[in-house]
Amino acid sequence: MKGQETRGFQSEVKQLLHLMIHSLYSNKEIFLRELISNASDAADKLRFRALSNPDLYEGDGELRVRVSFDKDKRTLTIADNGVGMNRDDVIDHLGTIAKSGTKSFLESMGSDQAKDSQLIGQFGVGFYSAFIVADKVTVRTRAAGDKPENGVFWESAGEGEYTVADITKDDRGTEITLHLREGEDEFLDDWRVRSIISKYSDHIALPVEIEKQEEKDGETIVSWEKINKAQALWTRNKSEIKDDEYNEFYKHIAHDFTDPLTWSHNRVEGKQEYTSLLYIPSQAPWDMWNRDHKHGLKLYVQRVFIMDDAEQFMPNYLRFVRGLIDSNDLPLNVSREILQDSTVTRNLRSALTKRVLQMLEKLAKDDAEKYQTFWKQFGLVLKEGPAEDHANQEAIAKLMRFASTHTDSSAQTVSLEDYISRMKEGQEKIYYITADSYAAAKSSPHLELLRKKGIEVLLLSDRIDEWMMNYLTEFDGKAFQSVSKVDESLEKLADEVDESAKEAEKALTPFVERVKTLLGDRVKEVRLTHRLTDTPAIVTTDADEMSTQMAKLFAAAGQAVPEVKYIFELNPDHVLVKRTADTQDEAQFNEWVELLLDQALFAERGTLEDPNQFIRRMNQLLVS
């Protein structure tokens, strides 16, 4: 053939093919869904391009996909008359995986086949799924608008290389022929192929036709029978659509293997006219944290496909939402640039955001177990919301779940409404603590007085929490208060001190002054506290001072960290504090004070500047 050359697959393709064939074999019929889905995309792209260049239809505007098989040759063919591909397209799309993050995705794969199957499904195997059932795949294609002699031939056994050549192809579009492996004869059975298409492709707008052969007067007459509804699912009446159809449509647009957690299908008429179909997946996509990858909805205008990943209609903290919007108010020649500055877009974004938040609120109310699945998968992303979307901050906060001292479990199941319903009489604030881990938060000495008083504290240990709490300052009229910061309400919780105790504390004034003199400007202040029950000392920060956790975030990001000046608070009732106060030997007094400060800093920060000095001091005092 003219222009024939043999090329090697991109290394990631070889790895993906191997993993896919082994991981997806138990669900091998999905290859037909994937190939028909690709054909549907090709038809959508042709319709869109033909808006500005109708000649691309080449006199054939009836778009469809045709499925046929040859039992003698053991081949199954899927052919469309969509946009087609030129030689460069073929090499780009069939010889490489044009997705950012491919390498990291493949590195996340393990030996757990069930997990691998889900991951590959999320990745969107598309064309490569053909190799699950075929030991050779042949592609003949021509791009719409190109001359017949500009057709392209592609063939591979999926083992490391492929052949590409120039051919003549009269009709535009793509024809994929699968040479089936031994033992895959079920895909040569008319009834079996029909049932798979009905199961997976009934909802797509593109007609799917299957070849019919009849013998008449000694002649074989070939005709084509449409076997799907070929009506865009979102245009149908909700009452006519079964849950199975919604689930399959989700898998079609999201390239996912699992059913979604929930969805919302709405048609809005009035000032703005649009239809939206929004899904919440049951598992996080593999690339959710990849900032380079576009996340967004499919955009249709008057049922004409315009673009994938239209991120303008959903805020970033809802980037896990899948689905589509079909607008009657945008122009057919809309571009991403026009969308960016469009009043229609801003109004749609606002409406769709509220729709998703309402959908999640309903899920939380109706099915706590499903909502817990959602929170485990997407809670960290939703926590970006208070900073990004002040207008919906209360609604977002309502959806959040936390660990707390009430449940004594690391599971994040407590809502802010739950917390407020359990607030003590006279309690005005929502108390929380941020730490590196649940265990560190739970055992923090800052909680001692609150535990004693039976006051619930939210235990925040996700990296994003400290940053989030800078924006989430109140809920339902109740202010949030970090228990590691100085606050009058926390001091008020302490038990009333009787006269004899006051006298004893007064007697400790010279001790406090000695500590201040020793530590100098290493601390902001030294004082006695009644917030502690079991711990001799803690460090706290002023309300306007950078918190310990925020300083850690700055450091982790490589940014300059301003020095945090702590307030050193001593428990006058603790035996170690009393012993230190009674110590007259200046050197030993200094050692005790340094030890108490190191303990407090270690409990607060989880690290010490000089751990060896701390150990030396500890050992020395233990034997003294």
UniProtKB/Swiss-Prot annotation:
Disulfide bonds: none annotated. Residues 1-336 are annotated as: A. GO terms for cellular component: cytoplasm. Coiled coil: none annotated. Keywords: ATP-binding, Chaperone, Cytoplasm, Nucleotide-binding, Stress response. GO terms for molecular function: ATP binding; ATP hydrolysis activity; ATP-dependent protein folding chaperone; unfolded protein binding. The keyword ATP-binding applies. InterPro entries: HATPase_C_sf, Heat_shock_protein_90_CS, HSP90_C, Hsp90_fam, Hsp90_N, Ribosomal_Su5_D2-typ_SF. Pfam families: HATPase_c_3, HSP90. Gene3D superfamilies: 3.30.230.80, 3.40.50.11260, Heat shock protein 90, C-terminal domain (1.20.120.790), Histidine kinase-like ATPase, C-terminal domain (3.30.565.10). Residues 337-552 are annotated as: B. It is found in: Cytoplasm. Residues 553-624 are annotated as: C. Its main location: cytoplasm. Belongs to the heat shock protein 90 family. Molecular chaperone. Has ATPase activity. Homodimer. This is Chaperone protein HtpG. The lineage of its organism: Bacteria, Pseudomonadati, Pseudomonadota, Gammaproteobacteria, Enterobacterales.
